[in-house]
Amino acid sequence: MNLIYNDLYQFSIHIPPMQFTIHQYLLMCADPILVSTGTMQQAEHILPEIKKLLKGQTLKYILVSHMESDECGGLIAFQKEYPDVITVCSQLCARELPGFGYNGKILAKKQDDLLDGNGFSLKFIDYPSEVHLQNGLAFYEENSKIFFSGDLMLRFGDAVGKTMDSFWKEEIAAIDLERIPNAEKLEVLQKSLLQLNPDLIAVGHGFCIKCK
């Protein structure tokens, strides 16, 4: 566990053979927010640390970028500990989760939707990260100016607790057709991202980025 930026805690695992780092985040505010659960094994590992940080507070929201085991594989573990937690996800993910046995509260969001709570204001950005290039979500917390990028802006290497510096526009320009294999959707996404002005990119994998 690392305090990566202001009230943002990072929980990570590095997989040496792949030189790949997987992160989850806890944004500490009046309504605490978890970004990604990790796999079931990761969730069971980080849950005691999260409970310690919350000091009796209830976990209010879990943000899920897209349907993948490292994003939402541990949902049931968190729902068991926090039965009223609300999973915030894409419309596709909201339809799929019950089919995998998840019966918790779900809130579906899409491009330009907002979610305001105690201590946070979230804006949602569509990006084609779900099966068959359907839209998943990235998240922008407007008060802290943190952009949660999901799998959009990833790098390889041991990035546990580490940050790097870069320019926001350069990070957007680096999103290519290998990442988003549809030119039209890529252009729409890049135009949408240029409307934001984050101070930090909290990546799903790799080094968090402090924006110059």
Residue map of PLM features:
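Active-site metal-binding motif and surrounding structural segment of the metallo-beta-lactamase
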Residues: 42-88
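Short catalytic-loop micro-motif centered on adjacent basic/acidic residues
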Residues: 33-36, 61-65, 124
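Short, basic, glycine/proline-bearing loop/turn elements
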Residues: 60-62, 119-122, 170-177
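Short, glycine/acidic-enriched loop or turn micro-motifs at the edges of active sites
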Residues: 39-40, 69, 154, 208
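Hydrophobic/aromatic beta-strand patches that form the interior of the parallel beta-sheet core
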Residues: 9-11, 63, 88, 125, ...
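Conserved beta-strand hairpin/beta-sheet module of binuclear metal-dependent hydrolase folds
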Residues: 2-51, 137-150
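Metallo-beta-lactamase
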Residues: 88-211
